Amino acid sequence: MRAALFPGSFDPITWGHIDLVKRASLIFDKVIVLVANNSNKSYLLSDIERYELTFEVIMSLGWTKIFVDKYDGVILDYALKNNIGFIVRGVRAFHDFEFEFERYVVNNKLNSSIDTVFLPSSDKYLFVRSDLVKELIKNKNFNLSNFIPELVQKKLKSKFIDKLS
């Protein structure tokens, strides 16, 4: 079975993430969406909230080959422990590719048994990113249907509407 890992912070999960997961599931027998923590990032949602929201969204789509997990450690270690041979990374533009390629080189030097597959963003989601969603939320813009699913909008609105007033 060819399994792949699609790691990210998913703060919050966007239509762009969902599109990449769906496309990865066409290539691999199993895709694990891994909600990971990055100590260099500050998050809008807690790690539990990010995991639960990502899980709810993915499960609501009814995809049988896609699973959600969370991990607070080195992504390469998770892949090794779970016998996963591929890491899927989405790239929107050249600067994403440059960053992800550097990450691939480091991972390859640490363990060459795990390969990286780069998937370009679909045109429709080229400018969709979690940072943009967070910026819009902070500016009290909750009409985000082009960026995130309704389930995510409701969660963010209920969590932040009072804090931002």
Curated annotation (Swiss-Prot):
Homohexamer. The keyword Glycosyltransferase does not apply. Its EC number is 2.7.7.3. The keyword Repeat does not apply. Reversibly transfers an adenylyl group from ATP to 4'-phosphopantetheine, yielding dephospho-CoA (dPCoA) and pyrophosphate. It is an enzyme of class 2 (transferase). Gene3D superfamilies: HUPs. ATP binds at residues 9-10, 17, 90-92, 100, 125-131. One of its GO terms (biological process) is coenzyme A biosynthetic process. Keywords: ATP-binding, Coenzyme A biosynthesis, Cytoplasm, Magnesium, Nucleotide-binding, Nucleotidyltransferase, Transferase. Substrate binds at residues 9, 41, 75, 89. It comes from Borrelia duttonii (strain Ly). This is Phosphopantetheine adenylyltransferase. One of its GO terms (cellular component) is cytoplasm. Its main location: cytoplasm.
